[in-house]
């Protein structure tokens, strides 16, 4: 079964210039914050690092990908953020080397160290980006892919979806050993 999307899913309000390079990474940052809460580690996080890969890295500054992830990590919503507040938020991060994570707690954040532009591509998709949260006793990493139109996916979800489609196409799977066992009485293979 294919997922249906409406015109409201495709046409989004958000800061540009590119839904794949700006809105997608921003939404990925929001999802990462939710994961930190779900994992129960949000309040323990002392640092966040962002790795941009492939196309997001190569055109990231020109398409404001770096700004988008900072705004997303700051808890700003791309649909409702006052446009005139964006430059102030970014300037504050630059000047103080701190980020207000999820608009709830301040952590150290140095743009030059904590946003990494990797020239290599991740194998799954050209627009990959990874967030790593560091906290006392560990780290939590999550990789997202901006697939266009502001849509963001995780590789695990796509793989699970592909497996489900295969299962539907072949509802009665059979392996080689079972096939050999079934064909033995007739000696036909």
Functional labels for PLM-detected ranges:
Residues 11-29:
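Conserved phosphate/anionic-ligand binding catalytic regions in large, soluble enzymes, centered on
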Residues 93-166, 172:
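Hydrophobic alpha-helical hairpins/lids featuring a short glycine-rich hinge
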